[in-house]
Amino acid sequence: MSGGLDILSLKEDDITKMLVATTHLGSENVNFQMEQYVYKRRADGVNILNLGKTWEKLQLAARAIVAIDNPSDIFVISSRPIGQRAVLKFAKYTDTTPIAGRFTPGAFTNQIQPAFREPRLLVVTDPNTDHQPIMEASYVNIPVIAFTNTDSPLRYIDIAIPCNNKSAHSIGLMWWLLAREVLRLRGTISRSVEWPVVVDLFFYRDPEEAEKEEAAAKELLPAPKIEEAVDHPVEETTNWADEVAAETVGGVEDWNEDTVKTSWGSDGQF
């Protein structure tokens, strides 16, 4: 698929990421249509995927995505919780439409319901859990790209990307690699420059583990310093209320000392 071009070949850094994320580890069961992607079978029964074919199918999927003129017509779907964050991040950087969580039945076939959509391409995380949108896409002739494990059914799937779709790190890495390849083909980022978006942003995080990490981080913080209270001397002040009362009492005249005279008579008699 790389056409002999070294710039399109799988780099050692990407191979290391795949091995660390266990992308090459399949399941113990193998679908007969997935046998072509199996490299070897270990002694414990786990099948090993061929990462070279994984990279070729990922490039093919990226070219199919870039061929769509309007990116919002591409729907990226994940019913499994481990792929929902990766789907949202992929949609953010590639301007596609995400469906993270439960898929509404009839969204592609029932034109009466408000949630009816007409996508031109689907990208799903797991054919087993996302079987409903894949089935509806087959009714209306929508091509489907899927991340498939060794035991995944390939019915109604046009482009299968073999990988470990049961691991949170593996599925996050595959969505990250697909997003990077799409942006490279669009010319948004250069192949000679490393994409600044780290792959950790695509990994699923358990809410309980995140709370535990936050609690542990708070415990490591130093305790706030408490300043000791200092007693400051209080200046003696005079009671201003007593002074005002004394001045008021001393300055008031006795109103009853003078005889009240009227103007009705000269000697004050009626």
UniProtKB/Swiss-Prot annotation:
Provide this UniProt record's keywords sorted from A to Z: Cytoplasm, Developmental protein, Nucleus, Ribonucleoprotein, Ribosomal protein
Q: Where in the cell is it found?
A: Cytoplasm; Nucleus
Against Gene3D superfamilies, the record matches this protein to:
Glucose-6-phosphate isomerase like protein, domain 1
Complex formation: Component of the small ribosomal subunit. Mature ribosomes consist of a small (40S) and a large (60S) subunit. The 40S subunit contains about 33 different proteins and 1 molecule of RNA (18S). The 60S subunit contains about 49 different proteins and 3 molecules of RNA (28S, 5.8S and 5S). Interacts with oho23B/rpS21.
**Source organism of the structure:** Drosophila erecta (Fruit fly)
Which HAMAP family has this protein been placed in? Ribosomal_S2_euk (MF_03015)
User: In its UniProt entry, what is this protein called?
Assistant: Small ribosomal subunit protein uS2
User: What would be one Pfam family of this protein?
Assistant: 40S_SA_C
| Taxonomic superkingdom | Eukaryota
Q: Name one GO biological process term.
A: translation
Q: Where is the composition biased (Polar residues)?
A: 261-270
Taken from the UniProt entry, a GO cellular component term is:
nucleus
Name the job this protein performs: Required for the assembly and/or stability of the 40S ribosomal subunit. Required for the processing of the 20S rRNA-precursor to mature 18S rRNA in a late step of the maturation of 40S ribosomal subunits. Required during oogenesis and imaginal development.
User: What family does the database annotate?
Assistant: Belongs to the universal ribosomal protein uS2 family.
